[in-house]
């Protein structure tokens, strides 16, 4: 055990709990375990986030100090965010919604991504713009062009629709279409709202 803490849960309603884990030593590979002292019991977890106490410039929900300082030391003229495949998402219902990346962390809608892992959006547009200000870099926001990533699609969709060895078919099913034209005005407004933000 490298660090431990006890959190008393005193409500049946949703509530945010915080604790600080201070490591007794450095380790290369660690694992977080949440254990219930009272059994049998049921605990529903909404979001678990491990976050460093020391952030770049002491910002709440800021970037890891060592990584952010490394970027700052490069003196970039601009910083691009998020990456292209993250912005375009894994399917039309998964295009990166910038409005879902601001506000309290626990209220941000998490995303699945093309690489098969969960993205909490702990780093959202607010943190991105603030970091750009902190290092005097121009922000270069990346937004989807109204279509999902060309590599998007679930594996079951590929397996169900592509005969073995049919590469053209596989490529065809990777693209899932774009935002319907009747929904495009709302999408364009979201883009304009980001410019105003």
Regions found by a protein language model. Name each.
Residues 16-19, 66, 124-127, 190-193:
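Well-ordered alpha-helical segments embedded in enzymatic catalytic cores
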